[in-house]
Amino acid sequence: MALNVVILAAGKGTRMRSDLPKVLHPIAHKSMVQHVIDTAHKVGSDAIQLVYGYGADKLQASLGEQQLNWVLQAEQLGTGHAVAQASPHIADNDTVLILYGDVPLIQQSTLEALLAARPENGVAILTVNLANPMGYGRIVRTPCEGQEQGKVVGIIEQKDATAEQLLINEINTGIMAVPGKQLKAWLSRLSNNNAQGEYYLTDIIAMAHDDGVAIDTAQPQSAIEVEGANNRVQLAQLERAYQAREAEKLMLAGANLRDPSRIDIRGEVTVGMDVMIDINVIFEGKVTLGNNVTIGAGAILIDCEIADNAEIKPYSIIEGAKLGVAASAGPFARLRPGAELKQDAHIGNFVEVKKAVIGVGSKAGHLAYLGDAVIGDGVNIGAGTITCNYDGANKHLTVIEDNVFVGSDTQLVAPVTIGKGATLGAGSTITRDVGENELVITRVKQKHLTGWQRPVKIKK
């Protein structure tokens, strides 16, 4: 039996006041609908039907390379009408899981519980109890022996509910698991004879009851999982809820967050034990932190690997880089893709490293650019050093071997190799290879002009 997931994503989202389709608005740097798609994959979907409408070009530009079956809903005539558009792509023996592109926080564990709750050839509905259920469809039950809550007999929408039904606190989330054959039959029987003139997906529950089909329910761990975003205020609330959830995961995994409310996680972060993360740190992409790593305030880490005992000092940007054991970067350092700091290496303030390896114990303390370079062990890079790697057309490599001392304000014009133990005098421009243990100084001889006077400002 295949798991066929239908994701409803056709709405415009007028209240967002945006040209962007509602489901493409981001949570943690990823569109809401992408969160839902990713979760669908995690529960083992065999096929995903994406029901789209408004902003088709933008949706396809964002999601087009993924394994999705695109189903057009030309007119938005209700949730039942939306699912019906996917009917031709649903097999009789499929289990159909219905999700929503603007409900991004639904968790894998919740959907697995819902699927497990579905009776054989029956229906499972995800419900939640709210203190204030205003605006939601209510779950209608009737007393049944052996079922404390009673048997589900239908779902009534807010606008169609009686005064008595409005007192019900158990609400429909819209998420459900349904057998394919029966779903298609029920969808064909839907009517829009209701207060909103729409084809309600929820009406299939009463049909299931009338047909004698077993109906069961499951509930999420938290109500926030099933909340959607119709405007930017709600979007921000979902963002905060997502960040709080991810921060909690980090703390349970061994990280100490200085303030869990001031961290942004926009990807997948793996942490070791006794990690310390200060305030206003941003993680993007896939980030791995070893044991005893320290991350300073305001740092940004993107797709990087940080080994045990390493330190990222405040306001540094680490992207596509690797830091070895006890290496350090910052404050105000920038490591670009391809940068690698070996054990005990140090990159200081206002140093930029790109596609360069910094050897064991080597250091560049301040104000330097090191690009397209291989730097050995025990090297000292003075302030103001630049590897001149670009000739206007191509990039070239600079090699600095072990135990080299590079004086301040030195330019190394690549391609060039500096031999082991060499010393480069401050202010030198190196255009040719330097041998082992050589001292090279290229600056102009110092001149002393006696009797010289500074210009005097002319009075006007």
From Swiss-Prot:
A GO molecular function held by the record: glucosamine-1-phosphate N-acetyltransferase activity
Q: Where does Mg(2+) bind?
A: 102, 230
Q: Which cofactor does it need?
A: Mg(2+)
Q: What is its main location?
A: cytoplasm
Record GO biological process? cell morphogenesis; cell wall organization; lipid A biosynthetic process; peptidoglycan biosynthetic process; regulation of cell shape; UDP-N-acetylglucosamine biosynthetic process
The record's region (Pyrophosphorylase) falls at 1-232
An annotated GO cellular component of this protein is: cytoplasm
Keyword check for Cell inner membrane? no
**Pathway listed:** Nucleotide-sugar biosynthesis; UDP-N-acetyl-alpha-D-glucosamine biosynthesis; N-acetyl-alpha-D-glucosamine 1-phosphate from alpha-D-glucosamine 6-phosphate (route II): step 2/2; Nucleotide-sugar biosynthesis; UDP-N-acetyl-alpha-D-glucosamine biosynthesis; UDP-N-acetyl-alpha-D-glucosamine from N-acetyl-alpha-D-glucosamine 1-phosphate: step 1/1; Bacterial outer membrane biogenesis; LPS lipid A biosynthesis
Question: Subunit info?
Answer: Homotrimer.
Family that this chain belongs to: In the N-terminal section; belongs to the N-acetylglucosamine-1-phosphate uridyltransferase family.
Function in brief: Catalyzes the last two sequential reactions in the de novo biosynthetic pathway for UDP-N-acetylglucosamine (UDP-GlcNAc). The C-terminal domain catalyzes the transfer of acetyl group from acetyl coenzyme A to glucosamine-1-phosphate (GlcN-1-P) to produce N-acetylglucosamine-1-phosphate (GlcNAc-1-P), which is converted into UDP-GlcNAc by the transfer of uridine 5-monophosphate (from uridine 5-triphosphate), a reaction catalyzed by the N-terminal domain.
| UniProt name for this protein | Bifunctional protein GlmU
What species is this protein from?
A: Shewanella baltica (strain OS223)
